[in-house]
Amino acid sequence: MTKKLLIKTWGCQMNEYDSSKMADLLGAANGYELTEEPTEADVLLLNTCSIREKAQEKVFHQLGRWKNLKDKKPDLVIGVGGCVATQEGDHIRQRAPYVDVIFGPQTLHRLPEMIRQSQSNEKPVMDISFPEIEKFDNLPEPKAEGATAFVSIMEGCSKYCTYCVVPYTRGEEVSRPLDDVLFEIAQLAEQGVREVNLLGQNVNAYRGPMHDGDICTFAELLRMVASIDGIDRLRFTTSHPLEFGDDIIAVYEDTPELVSFLHLPVQSGSDRILTMMKRPHTAIEYKSIIRKLRKARPDIQISSDFIVGFPGETAKDFQDTMKLIKDVDFDMSFSFIFSARPGTPAADYPCDIPEQEKKDRLAELQQQVNSQAMRYSRLMLDTEQRVLVEGPSKKNLMELRARTENNRVVNFEGSADLIGQFVDVKITDVFANSLRGELVRTEKDMGLRVVMTPAEMMEKTRREDDLGVGTFTP
């Protein structure tokens, strides 16, 4: 009888990626099939996130519901992974002794063995260590699920922003070897993937070891991924202003596969608050990056992260943030009220901002960004947009759902054989959360690009004179 696996995922795209790898791993090693029904499952896995407030209590509430299932089905295996597991492993073991397996983001590759150990020893197994990049060497070959795919290129963060738990839960920055990243993407491309999103807590800090002992920069990686046959659209998330150098900006000038949309977190427009956050940039330095980007790619649209109500944030600090939002003209944002994370320096900062004031600031910020986003959407009316068809529309199964470069969903009438392909559509209507379009042309009429090899892309990126001095020639 086939064993069933349920994975519940909270948090960022890195967690979504990790959960997909857990499913691949347990499917390949033990023949588990995914289910969405907890009552059918033989293994229940919770992949957790510790970014938001009350993350731990949310975990224990979910585990309490699963405990009822385990009481009725004693052989049921319950596992907790992700950042809360790393941060609160011992506490989980004490408060929820019925949990069989506790693992961190860096040890998910050991999951099959940990499950077997818990079953044979009939006692909980925990491994929340940081074995750096080892997990990627022990995962099965990637399996494509549609025309888009996420690929993790690095783990961890070494910036230690005062509000953030990532360095403590995922470790410091470790880059995957270049060949491993390219091979995974090439495998996905062979399975029909057309768009790749490179993942990491700080992707532009990527420094991937190469087979010749050299180091590949993020800019070089972008060009090489863009050269892989079949990959026609390239995204990345999340990046950091500190390492968003001119070499990365130059990629926007000569690599059309890289989309005209960038998520670049700034968190605040107040230099005083940025200093308290240990963000090593000013608002002006951030705007300087955006100016260079728009010179390289005039139509690029920018999204960002914002924290309001950070301890000590005054009305002026908040207005500085609002000014930055208007000056940069952000298209989208992920914005939150500050939530103290245990173990971070900011958790000890005194805060006397009334809760209602925090909520009012958040509402004002979101209203401003939403109005800017709607204006951008209206500018797309009656224009042609190249979109990647992802599948049936979620609102009308007789229509198709596609995505623009600037991350907007477009619904349009078309046949199912267009799924996984690029098409051009004319935007005919604009809504708050989506667009409507009409099919103009299909992929066979496009002539998307001339294929270049990775070696040709590297030659384009790296040239050295007789003294060994490198120059970039676009």
UniProtKB/Swiss-Prot annotation:
Enzyme Commission designation: 2.8.4.3
Top enzyme class: transferase
Residues holding [4Fe-4S] cluster 2: 157, 161, 164
PROSITE patterns given in the database record: MTTASE_N, MTTASE_RADICAL, RADICAL_SAM, TRAM
Compartments, as annotated in UniProt: Cytoplasm
Pfam families named among the record's database cross-references: Radical_SAM, TRAM, UPF0004
Cofactor entry: [4Fe-4S] cluster
Residue ranges occupied by any TRAM domain in the UniProt entry: 378-441
Keywords assigned: 4Fe-4S, Cytoplasm, Iron, Iron-sulfur, Metal-binding, S-adenosyl-L-methionine, Transferase, tRNA processing
InterPro entries: Elp3/MiaA/NifB-like_rSAM, Methylthiotransferase, Methylthiotransferase_CS, Methylthiotransferase_N, Methylthiotransferase_N_sf, MiaB_methiolase, rSAM, rSAM_horseshoe
Cofactor comment text: Binds 2 [4Fe-4S] clusters. One cluster is coordinated with 3 cysteines and an exchangeable S-adenosyl-L-methionine.
Binding site for [4Fe-4S] cluster 1: 12, 49, 83
GO molecular function list: 4 iron, 4 sulfur cluster binding; metal ion binding; N6-isopentenyladenosine methylthiotransferase activity
Family annotation (HAMAP family): tRNA_metthiotr_MiaB (MF_01864)
Family: Belongs to the methylthiotransferase family. MiaB subfamily.
Subunit-structure text: Monomer.
Function per UniProt: Catalyzes the methylthiolation of N6-(dimethylallyl)adenosine (i(6)A), leading to the formation of 2-methylthio-N6-(dimethylallyl)adenosine (ms(2)i(6)A) at position 37 in tRNAs that read codons beginning with uridine.
The name this protein goes by in its record: tRNA-2-methylthio-N(6)-dimethylallyladenosine synthase
